[in-house]
C-alpha cells in the first residue's frame, strides 16, 4: 500500500479536480457549484425507462459501511449502478472487523479485491480520511459519514434541495434545528452554506446540544425556537442522536419536543413559502410533528431523490479526477 503524496491536497488532484470526497471544509465554491450542476444533469437519468449511463462501466465501487444506514447505503448503491459500475457492499456485522480485525487490515484486504472506489461510513471521526491517506493512490475514497465529523454528500444533497426550491443562496435565511452537537450533517451543511454565499445561517437548540465555539462557522445561535425561526426561508431539522449522547444532555424526548419540536404553529413564524428538510430517519413527535413532515412545506422525500443524483455526481467526478491524476503521474514519470 502506497500513501498519497503528502505535498498534494488530499481531496484534489494536481488540476484542482475532485479525487476523494472526505469533507466540505476548504473546498472552493466553484467546485461545490460544479457538483450541484453535475447532479442537476443526472436528475434526468432517474426519469428514463432505462436508468443508466455508462460513465463507470468496468469500474468497481465498494460500499464499506461500519455503521448502519439504510438510506445512505441504498442511494450510494443506486448511484453507482446508474453509472454502470459493479457494486460490492460489505456487511460489517458479518465481516472480520467484528472478530477483531483492524481498520487498516480490513482496508488491505479490500484493496486486494482491486476495487476502484471505496464509500466508507464509520462511527469514528477521521476514518475516511485515514483510509484515503493509506489506500492505493489509484483508489478514490468517498466519506459516507464519519462520527460527528462530516457527511459531505448529505451536505451537498441538502444544498441541491435548497437551490432547486429557492434558487440563489445569496438572500436566504436558513435555520438548522436540534442536536447540533452530535450532528455531522449540521457541520457539513454549515460549511456548504457559508461557501455558497448564504448570509444568514442560524442554529437552534438547547445549550447542552450546541457545541462551544460554533460561531466560528459564521452562524447565529438561538436557544428559543420561535425566535430562531422568524422569517427563515429554509428549516433543516435534525434527529436526536441518543446513541452518541452521554447522560444529562437532555431531560427527555418529550421535553425536547415541547421546546424544540417543529409544529405547524411554530412553522408559521417562518416565511410563508419556507421549506422543511430532514436528513432522516425522522422521529415523529420528537423533532417534528407528522402534519409538518407530510405537509406542503416538506421537501424531505425530494431530498432522497436528489441524494441519488448528488452521489452520482460525486462518484463520477472523483473517478474522473483519479484518472486525470494517474495520467499526470505517468507523464511526470517519463
UniProtKB/Swiss-Prot annotation:
EC number in record: 2.1.3.2
Disulfide bonds: none
GO cellular component labels: cytosol
GO biological process: 'de novo' pyrimidine nucleobase biosynthetic process; 'de novo' UMP biosynthetic process; amino acid metabolic process
GO molecular function annotation: amino acid binding; aspartate carbamoyltransferase activity
SUPFAM superfamilies, per the entry: Aspartate/ornithine carbamoyltransferase (SSF53671)
Keyword Transferase included in the entry's annotation: yes
Pathway: Pyrimidine metabolism; UMP biosynthesis via de novo pathway; (S)-dihydroorotate from bicarbonate: step 2/3
Catalytic activity: carbamoyl phosphate + L-aspartate = N-carbamoyl-L-aspartate + phosphate + H(+)
Chain's role: Catalyzes the condensation of carbamoyl phosphate and aspartate to form carbamoyl aspartate and inorganic phosphate, the committed step in the de novo pyrimidine nucleotide biosynthesis pathway.
Membership in a protein family: Belongs to the aspartate/ornithine carbamoyltransferase superfamily. ATCase family.
PANTHER family: ASPARTATE CARBAMOYLTRANSFERASE (PTHR45753:SF6), ORNITHINE CARBAMOYLTRANSFERASE, MITOCHONDRIAL (PTHR45753)
Name this polypeptide is given: Aspartate carbamoyltransferase catalytic subunit
Upper classification of the organism: Bacteria, Pseudomonadati, Pseudomonadota, Gammaproteobacteria, Pseudomonadales
Gene behind the chain: pyrB
Amino acid at each position: 500500500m502506497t500513501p498519497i503524496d503528502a505535498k498534494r491536497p488530499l481531496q484534489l488532484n494536481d488540476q484542482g479536480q475532485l479525487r476523494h470526497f472526505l469533507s466540505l471544509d476548504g473546498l472552493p465554491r466553484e467546485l461545490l457549484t460544479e457538483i450541484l450542476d453535475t447532479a442537476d444533469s443526472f436528475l434526468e437519468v432517474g426519469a428514463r425507462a432505462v436508468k443508466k449511463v455508462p460513465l463507470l462501466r468496468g469500474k468497481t465501487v465498494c460500499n464499506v459501511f461500519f455503521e448502519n444506514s439504510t438510506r445512505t447505503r441504498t442511494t450510494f448503491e443506486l448511484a453507482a449502478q446508474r453509472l454502470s459500475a459493479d457494486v460490492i457492499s460489505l456487511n460489517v456485522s458479518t465481516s472480520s472487523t467484528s472478530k477483531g480485525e483492524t481498520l487498516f487490515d480490513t482496508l488491505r484486504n479490500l484493496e486486494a479485491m482491486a476495487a476502484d472506489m471505496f464509500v466508507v461510513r464509520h462511527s469514528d471521526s477521521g476514518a475516511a480520511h485515514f483510509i484515503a491517506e493509506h489506500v492505493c493512490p489509484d483508489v478514490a475514497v468517498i466519506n459516507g459519514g464519519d462520527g460527528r465529523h462530516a457527511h459531505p454528500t448529505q451536505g451537498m444533497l441538502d444544498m441541491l434541495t435548497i437551490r432547486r426550491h429557492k434558487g440563489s443562496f445569496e438572500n436566504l435565511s436558513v435555520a438548522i434545528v436540534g442536536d447540533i452537537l452530535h450532528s455531522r450533517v449540521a457541520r457539513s451543511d454549515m460549511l456548504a452554506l457559508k461557501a455558497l454565499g448564504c448570509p444568514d445561517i442560524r442554529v437552534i437548540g438547547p445549550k447542552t446540544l450546541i457545541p462551544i465555539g460554533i460561531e466560528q462557522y459564521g452562524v447565529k445561535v438561538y436557544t428559543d425556537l420561535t425566535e430562531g425561526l422568524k422569517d427563515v426561508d429554509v428549516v433543516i431539522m435534525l434527529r436526536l442522536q441518543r446513541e452518541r449522547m452521554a447522560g444529562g444532555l437532555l431531560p427527555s424526548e418529550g421535553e425536547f419536543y415541547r421546546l424544540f419540536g417543529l409544529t405547524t404553529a411554530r412553522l408559521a413564524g417562518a416565511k410563508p413559502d419556507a421549506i422543511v428538510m430532514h436528513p432522516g430517519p425522522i422521529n415523529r413527535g420528537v423533532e417534528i410533528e407528522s402534519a409538518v413532515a407530510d405537509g406542503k412545506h416538506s421537501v424531505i422525500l425530494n431530498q432522497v431523490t436528489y441524494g441519488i443524483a448528488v452521489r452520482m455526481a460525486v462518484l463520477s467526478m472523483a473517478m474522473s479526477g483519479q484518472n486525470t491524476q494517474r495520467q499526470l503521474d505517468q507523464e511526470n514519470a517519463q
